[in-house]
């Protein structure tokens, strides 16, 4: 069986990179979102209620409770955590010495602390996904065994612990839950766009932050959009069970299908770090053999030499072909695929009913849980077999302790995850073991396992609703307040901001889907714009002179609701077209009774002003200095700058101190090729230990 040492290293590096992006992206927005003059000041969320310290920490698990001990308020504590998280993640990305469980525990704890006070701006599925992935990374991070001076068994590197494959299996299970649920909820929501296979005819222009490529994708033929929806259902519903296939080529095919989907989403939409994190999860489908990039000669040497092995290889190939054929027949049958040779199109339509889907879901939900349990049982048996091979009493004892702890943790996390996974099918949720429910309810607030289901319903079927803020000095001449990232100016192309998530722009998209009373924070945004608070202005326009009211705050602010569509191909110089719908938020000014009433209704009036004197604290002054240095940079530039710095350092490390990646188990014990030894023997040399050892081992590019 191929090992997974290199994929685990890639996973840990990928998680570190995503944490770096998440912390740095949030850091740039903290003053405007959570500062004393922000939209939703964070200090309102952490108010002692007379409970004990540990009880308070358990009920609201955040390190920000300790911020006053450092002389910081809650917002400054957020900045400190974000900066430390960015630096720690950057270090883990650059050096493997920081691929330690404690490092990933700190990253997870810091992000959990941030999410506890993030309120509506951190209520996204990818924030929950990052927390769950970060906790798994803590378990995946290697814990070596004591050194062994005796030779390790064939195929077993001496420092590898038997339990290391168990937590990494949970990553595969998480990827399965994410993709399978995301596909199923599109149909269980009864959204007519998904059932009619027309979702992508709307998606590209109605998603929150499209990219320029989305404009071109939107104008593709309708039949291709519908075929793409069919492919999406195939990749998200039919392919994920192959994650647990015993045939590795089936797992690799599943891997490449998931990568294809995520890359296409990245090209057409700005979904911050979500798709990057999903790509990181797909490393659980890889193995060392696939990443070793061995030559064709070595592949020929692995061809079966005996007839039992040849028969097994033939049966495996037949199984692969049967699976591919079954998938193809299923897609053709359930989506009515037909080739229209006259029109040169592929026609598709949904050939099943909602009742049939519900019955199918009742049939497969519990079996998929048992599939996961069977796969986990195999991993446990494999880990036990590896433990049997450990040599040395001390090493065997340490390995037994590690296997017991991590095996128990793996089984417990699997049981916990079954509860949110079963949300998509109520009857299966009710039949789940009560112990799993109790275990989940105990740790639910830690977000160790979450339910997922992205793009449940397609919005904006009649055009994307968009809120446009306007300001005025006299109440007659109105000037639009243009945001940096969300659609507004008809002639401005959609930006590329990934992996940054502009949290305010995202919430403006959600606000447009309903009345402003469904988004209480919007009233606070209007108040801050009337007050001319610079931290909030920087969320709208980081370059303050680009903000139309940078010299003097507007006297009046209102909001209009428009419907936006992508422009037609023949409309030169425009990316969008729009139509006015209605007034979204009435014209208000400071002291307006209507505004004051809304602030009281939503509890947004600030009754406890921040304490003065915090600026004299040395740590507070240091945070202020860092903020002053970084504030001129736009968030995407900062994040891409960090990534560029990592790339440059990696290149310098490769040039100045080349070190090969950890070799796979097969490579470590692979004898030198015969032709190399023969060639070496022809070179007369008094030092025979140089002849065969001078060959530089094949190196893989650093990830």
From Swiss-Prot:
<keyword id="KW-0812">Transmembrane</keyword>
<dbReference type="GO" id="GO:0051604">
    <property type="term" value="P:protein maturation"/>
</dbReference>
<feature type="region of interest" description="Disordered">
    <location>
        <begin position="660"/>
        <end position="703"/>
    </location>
</feature>
<feature type="compositionally biased region" description="Basic and acidic residues">
    <location>
        <begin position="663"/>
        <end position="673"/>
    </location>
</feature>
<feature type="transmembrane region" description="Helical">
    <location>
        <begin position="165"/>
        <end position="185"/>
    </location>
</feature>
<feature type="compositionally biased region" description="Polar residues">
    <location>
        <begin position="680"/>
        <end position="696"/>
    </location>
</feature>
<feature type="transmembrane region" description="Helical">
    <location>
        <begin position="102"/>
        <end position="122"/>
    </location>
</feature>
<feature type="transmembrane region" description="Helical">
    <location>
        <begin position="74"/>
        <end position="94"/>
    </location>
</feature>
<comment type="similarity">
    <text>Belongs to the lipase maturation factor family.</text>
</comment>
<dbReference type="GO" id="GO:0005789">
    <property type="term" value="C:endoplasmic reticulum membrane"/>
</dbReference>
<keyword id="KW-0256">Endoplasmic reticulum</keyword>
<feature type="transmembrane region" description="Helical">
    <location>
        <begin position="10"/>
        <end position="30"/>
    </location>
</feature>
<dbReference type="Pfam" id="PF06762">
    <property type="entry name" value="LMF1"/>
</dbReference>
<protein>
    <recommendedName>
        <fullName>Lipase maturation factor 2</fullName>
    </recommendedName>
</protein>
<feature type="glycosylation site" description="N-linked (GlcNAc...) asparagine">
    <location>
        <position position="489"/>
    </location>
</feature>
<feature type="transmembrane region" description="Helical">
    <location>
        <begin position="399"/>
        <end position="419"/>
    </location>
</feature>
<feature type="transmembrane region" description="Helical">
    <location>
        <begin position="637"/>
        <end position="657"/>
    </location>
</feature>
<feature type="transmembrane region" description="Helical">
    <location>
        <begin position="312"/>
        <end position="332"/>
    </location>
</feature>
<feature type="transmembrane region" description="Helical">
    <location>
        <begin position="227"/>
        <end position="247"/>
    </location>
</feature>
<keyword id="KW-1133">Transmembrane helix</keyword>
<feature type="transmembrane region" description="Helical">
    <location>
        <begin position="364"/>
        <end position="384"/>
    </location>
</feature>
<keyword id="KW-0472">Membrane</keyword>
<keyword id="KW-0325">Glycoprotein</keyword>
<feature type="transmembrane region" description="Helical">
    <location>
        <begin position="126"/>
        <end position="146"/>
    </location>
</feature>
<feature type="transmembrane region" description="Helical">
    <location>
        <begin position="259"/>
        <end position="279"/>
    </location>
</feature>
<dbReference type="Pfam" id="PF25179">
    <property type="entry name" value="LMF1_C"/>
</dbReference>
<dbReference type="InterPro" id="IPR009613">
    <property type="entry name" value="LMF"/>
</dbReference>
<comment type="function">
    <text>Involved in the maturation of specific proteins in the endoplasmic reticulum. May be required for maturation and transport of active lipoprotein lipase (LPL) through the secretory pathway.</text>
</comment>
